[in-house]
């Protein structure tokens, strides 16, 4: 169940793919993404696998919800175009779904929700995902950002540990 392929211990690719196949879990994710889109909340989604990202994107598209999907095996042109559409909110695109692409080196000041659908045992990876939305005003981000985490993560990390890195930016204690 645990792999060390990324330089840190985390769930194996096979485990993440299995989690991504949960029909009930995906329906709950879809329901919440639809609500966020209806409220015009720019949202970054961290999927469990490439296939999971593609399934979520396809399901949203089928119901008429604009979104973009990015993953490592896409051409850089396709990836850059998808990111541009999200950043510019082109065609009212409020949702960007990704798998292992936008955890570092991606900045979009319009993100108002970070939606983590992939469990992780790595506090580093978890912090990187949170960091896409929790930049705070001093770092060019928003004052508020909604975090939606599928129950898999915060059972591993207590809340103080998960959020302590960002207290300096948000003025928290």
Briefly describe each language-model feature range:
Residues 43-46, 69, 113-116:
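Short catalytic-loop micro-motif centered on adjacent basic/acidic residues
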Residues 1-47:
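Conserved interdomain linker/interface between the two RecA-like ATPase lobes of SF2 helicase motors
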Residues 44, 53-55, 65-102:
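Conserved helicase ATPase core of P-loop NTP-dependent helicases/translocases
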Residues 1, 127, 135-173:
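A conserved SF2-helicase RecA2
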Residues 94-120, 125-132, 144-150:
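A short beta-strand element within the Helicase C-terminal
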Residues 59, 82-85, 110, 125-132, ...:
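Alpha-helical scaffold elements adjacent to nucleotide-binding pockets in ATP/GTP-utilizing enzyme cores
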Residues 52-59, 104, 125:
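Phosphate- and divalent-cation-binding pockets in alpha/beta enzyme and binding domains
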Residues 36-42, 63-66, 109-112:
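Short, surface-exposed connector motifs at secondary-structure boundaries
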